[in-house]
A protein has these predicted regions:
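Repeated loop/turn-to-beta-strand initiation elements of outer-membrane beta-barrel proteins
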Residues: 61-64, 108-112, 138-146
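Transmembrane beta-strand segments of Gram-negative outer membrane beta-barrel proteins
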Residues: 21-38
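Helix-adjacent hinge/juxtasegments
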Residues: 75-116
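Transmembrane beta-strands of outer-membrane beta-barrel pores
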Residues: 34-40, 70-74, 103-107, 118-124, ...
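Outer-membrane beta-barrel domain signature
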Residues: 21, 38-43, 84-90, 120-125, ...
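Outer-membrane beta-barrel "beta-signal"
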Residues: 101, 165-177
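Bacterial Sec-dependent N-terminal signal peptides
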Residues: 1-26, 173, 177
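Residues that define the transmembrane beta-barrel architecture of outer-membrane proteins
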Residues: 26-28, 44-48, 91-97, 110, ...
Length: 177
């Protein structure tokens, strides 16, 4: 995991030099959003999601950045609430720290995009975090845009005697600036 974060930091550091003479702009971009994930699989826990990502927009179609989120979980269906608390010492939250890459399909006010977040969910029994998604960006001005995406989110949960994934179908909305 340390190697992955180091690779992202090196990539962010090197991109300005790579594009310096190509005429493509590099600028700061921030994103903030929230949403809900609906649990699927054997560990079907719904969750509320808050996240923020900050990084660089490279040309009109590529964004790379680092982000953090807060995922608050709740039980669903026949999953007893105590089964999750047993592995999290009563807590229901994971705090994923991740690298984000977004590719915009078009250089227009309204554009589809593909995005992927890969990182680690910080918690006593945290683990790998991944969240690929597809979405649509609606430009609201020269810099501000509304983003709506749909994807899948998985948070690995590890404990001394078990390891399981907490998967969910996620719907998010947010602003990029």
């Amino acid at each position: 995991m340390k190697k992955l974060f180091f690779a992202w930091i090196m990539a962010l550091w090197c991109f300005p030099a790579v594009f310096a003479q190509s005429g493509q702009g590099i600028s700061y971009q921030g994103e903030a959003g929230m949403g809900a994930a609906f649990g699927v699989g054997s560990n079907a826990y719904n969750r509320f999601v808050l996240e923020t990502v900050h990084g660089v927009r490279i040309g009109p179609r590529l964004f790379v950045g680092l982000g953090g989120a807060w995922n608050y979980y709740s039980a669903r269906g026949d999953m007893p609430d105590d089964s999750f608390r047993e592995y999290t010492d009563g807590g229901r939250s994971f705090v994923p720290i991740f690298a984000d890459m977004t590719v915009y399909v078009l250089d227009r006010r309204i554009s589809a995009y593909l995005k992927v977040d890969i990182g680690y969910g910080i918690h006593k029994h945290g683990g790998i975090y991944a969240a690929p998604a597809v979405g649509v960006k609606f430009g609201l001005g020269s810099v501000l845009a509304l983003n709506i995406d749909f994807g899948f989110q998985v948070q690995q949960q590890t404990a001394p005697d078990t390891s399981s994934g907490l998967g969910g179908i996620v719907l998010r909305a947010g602003l990029s600036f």
